[in-house]
């Protein structure tokens, strides 16, 4: 559900604006995706940093009946899971560009890879690392969700690039 929400938000915002700029020029379309990428990365770093620091204070509010050790586990798991929205956000961004070029199959396949990552977490990571292994499986799934789309995105010629300018 979280993945679908990210995808819907990204595609609702990005696809029409990207296509509008693409009709103007490829350069304008590239500028747009690079600007969106920069805004996304800055926002994510800011939000993740604040959340990471705040988690020990937030955990008792969300799991008030848990003992201290369990609350620490919740904090640890949540901190691991903070990586996942980064990959899923980039994946939603990638899929928006791909869908602009009417490439739908790769996004559909990416959902399978997301689940494969979670299954790997359950089968491989949990026996080795315990419950945090499940969180790492979710992170792996979100990474696979993004990475599977990258080759198709490169072929479009519109792979986003982060360029730092003065």
Predicted region positions:
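Membrane-embedded alpha-helical bundles of multi-pass transporters/translocases
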Residues: 1-166
């Amino acid at each position: 559900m979280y993945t679908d929400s990210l995808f819907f938000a990204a595609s609702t915002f990005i696809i029409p604006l990207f296509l509008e700029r693409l009709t103007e020029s490829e350069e304008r379309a590239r500028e747009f995706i690079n600007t969106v990428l920069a805004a996304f990365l800055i926002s994510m770093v800011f939000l993740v940093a604040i959340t990471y620091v705040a988690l020990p204070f937030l955990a008792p509010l969300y799991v008030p009946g848990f003992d201290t050790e369990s609350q620490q586990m919740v904090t640890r798991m949540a901190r691991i899971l903070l990586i996942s929205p980064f990959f899923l956000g980039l994946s939603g961004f990638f899929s928006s560009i791909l869908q602009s070029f009417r490439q739908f199959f790769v996004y559909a396949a990416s959902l399978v890879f997301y689940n494969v990552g979670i299954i790997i977490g359950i089968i491989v990571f949990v026996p080795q690392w315990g419950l945090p292994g499940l969180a790492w499986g979710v992170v792996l799934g979100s990474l696979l969700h993004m990475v599977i789309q990258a080759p198709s995105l490169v072929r479009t010629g519109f792979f986003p690039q982060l360029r730092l300018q003065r």
